[in-house]
Amino acid sequence: LNATDLSFTIDVDSEEVFNLGGRVELSGIKNGEIQAFNMAGSTSDKYGQIFGAPTDGSLKNINITGLDFGNLLAAVAMEDEQLLLAELQTGFGVTAVSIDGLVANIADLKAKLTSGKIEIADNVIENFSLTDFGFTDTDEEIALDIGKAQFKGLNLGFDFLSEKAVIENATQFYGLTEIGIYDVSYTIEGNEFGIDDLSLTDVALDSGFLVKSTLNANGIRIPIELIAEMDRSVARSIENFTDSESFTLSFSNSNDFNTEDGTYDVNLSLGVEGFAAIKINAAYAGLDFQRLRRVYKSEDFIEMMDGLSKIGEELSMSSVYFEYTDDQLADVILSQVPDVKQLVMMSDMQIDMFLSQYPDQADQLKASIKAFLEGTNTFKVSMNAEAEVKIMDIPDLFVSGDMTNSILVAFEGN
C-alpha cells in the first residue's frame, strides 16, 4: 500500500490556515502484521485552529519494521493489561525503528531530532540512539541540547507488574551493557549546565555482582550562579580560581574483578578545572568471590560481618599508584605561605622521623616534595609488591623495617 503526495488544506478567506501533507508506505500486511511502515510529511497550523496553538512541523522519514498492529489494537480496545504488557515486552513485534529529520514547533515550544534508531531482538533493545536532539521553551527560558544519547542491551522480557522481578532485574541493570550521553547543554534563565561525556560501558555481572565496568563523567559544568545561591563565599573562591562562570569537574572509574582467580583491578580519577586532578590505580588479589556471594546473600548481621572480616584477612595488594596533577590549587595555597623554604625544612624533619628505618625512601620523598613545591606540577607515589602482600600484614612490615624487601616504593615530583 503506497500513498504519495498526500495533501489536505484548510483555507479561510482565501488564506491557507492549515496544511497536512506527506506520504505513507505499507508493505507485507498480513494477519494484522505490517512488515514495513514508512512515512514522511509536514504540517502547519498557522493560527492554532486544529492543534490549539500555532504549529508547524516536518518529518523527513520514519521507518518501522515488524509492527504487530492487530494485537496492539486488540489490547487497547479490550483494555487488556496483561496482553498490552505482553506486547510491550515483545516491542509489539517491532524489530527496528529509525527516525530522520524531525522538527516540531508549537507556540513557544520547539523540538528537533536529526536521527534516532532502535533495534530490538528477543525482547532486548540491542541498540537505542539519538543524534542531535534539541528542545527549547522560550517562554520559560529553557533550552536542552543533546549531541548524542545511546544505550544497549535493555531487557524487556520480565514481568513489569512483579515487584520482585523489577528489583531482581534492577540489580542486573536490566541487562544494560552500555549507556552514554554526550555533548549535553541545559540552560535555564541564562545559567548553563553541561556534560561533555557521561557513559557507562563494559558492563559485566556475575550472580548479581557488578564485576566489570567503566564509568566516565567528563566536563560536568555547574553554573557558579547556582553555587552562589548556596554559598557566596565558596562561589567567589571558585570564580577566582577558574576565571569562569562554571565549576567544571571530571570523574572516571573502572573496575575489573576476575572471579576465577580473585584478582581485582580498580582505576579512579577525579579532576576539577582550575584546581587539580588526582589519579589512583590499584591491583588486589585474594578476593574470594564465593565468600563474597555468601556475605551478600546472608541475612544474619554477625555472619555477614564475620565473612567480611575473613575476606579482609585474605585480601592482598599487588600494586598501588597515586598521582596528583596541579592546575592552580598549589600555586594559590603556596602564595599564602610566608616562607616555602621553611615549609620544606619542616617537611624534611617530619619525613626523617616517619621513615627513619627507610633512609633511601626518605631521601627520595624529600627530593620529590621539594621538586613539586618548586614546579607545582605533579607528585606521584607508587607501591609494587614483588609478590602479593596481604594488606593486614603491611603495618607490621612497615614497623619491622622490612617492608622494602616485599614492596618497592617510589616517589616522584616535578
Please provide the spans of the model-predicted regions.
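Glycine-rich, small/hydroxylated-residue low-complexity segments
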Residues: 1-414
